[in-house]
UniProtKB/Swiss-Prot annotation:
UniProt entry tagged with the keyword Methyltransferase: no
Domain of life: Eukaryota
InterPro entries with a match to the protein in the record: FAH, Fumarylacetoacetase-like_C, Fumarylacetoacetase_C_sf
GO cellular component, one term: mitochondrion
Similarity-based family: Belongs to the FAH family.
Co-factor binding details: Requires a divalent metal cation for activity.
Pfam families found in the cross-reference section: FAA_hydrolase
Cofactor(s) this protein requires: Mg(2+); Mn(2+)
Organism: Xenopus laevis (African clawed frog)
EC number assigned by the record: 5.3.2.2
Main location: mitochondrion
Top EC category: isomerase
Stated name of the protein: Oxaloacetate tautomerase fahd2, mitochondrial
Amino acid sequence: MLTQTRVALRVLKNAHLTLPKRNISQSPALSMRLVQFQSSDSPSPRIGLELQDGGNIIDLNAYDPSLPCRMREFLEMGESALQTAKSALDSNQHILSRSNISLLAPITNPEKIICIGMNYVDHCLEQNVPVPKEPIIFNKFASSIVGPSDPIRIPEESQEVDWEAELAFVIGKKGKNIKEEDAMDHVVGYTVAHDVSARDWQMKKNGKQWLLGKTFDTFCPLGPALVTKDVISDPHNLGIRCRVNGDLVQNSNTNQMVFKTEALIAWASKFVTLNPGDVFLTGTPPGVGVFRKPPVFLKAGDVVRCEIDELGAISNPVV
């Protein structure tokens, strides 16, 4: 075990040593913050652009009625859809007041949600386990996705529901056997994710296979926006934090990731074809409840806020 710790410390030493940033940076005014939303005039999902984090929304479906109303289908259109969105942003038309809309998850029906376990050096140190030599892959079902302010429901089957703030990225271009040097061509952007986890089902039941503990309904809040990659300074050097009832429980930086975006795409695409709309959850930093002494788990009445610099924050009540 001492050897494992030394290996992890060597990896930590070689990682970027930028300290976690303290405040959420505001994205540039003309950033592409793609959202799905409902308005007071229409209960059906629509595609929009958030003018800034927490700002008003450009209704892309009003700007161009030929655009699909769901993000996956929008991304399947490829570069033409993004160019239309940029034109809408430049036009400054069809703006809806934030008070008249409610945000949904930026994507609600991906073909795949690919999740990475133990992908932060400091999270491996927290568990006193070796840093993985290959990505550890598991998944969630799309039925677990909820929006940036929707409730997280504690299932009757679990007494050990835990928090995990994560950086997520979304595929924008189909590919198989993708090389690392080409991987970013397949990424459309990034968002904030919360990999809610039932530790009893993940670690003690179901043969310790992770799926059931990870994929209860409401166990994948996403949002607030899908921020296109071109306006993010460096996705692998962003402060990432989680707060439970206002208390800071996770505080790290994405530079602690063992496998970055490019490596994850190259690895996963060896096994499966990646399609537009597929979501990757890239792992969580230290500070989760299960490894506290004594362990701490979520309960009804809690509020969990996950935030990442340049992307924004999601805040979900627990019921």
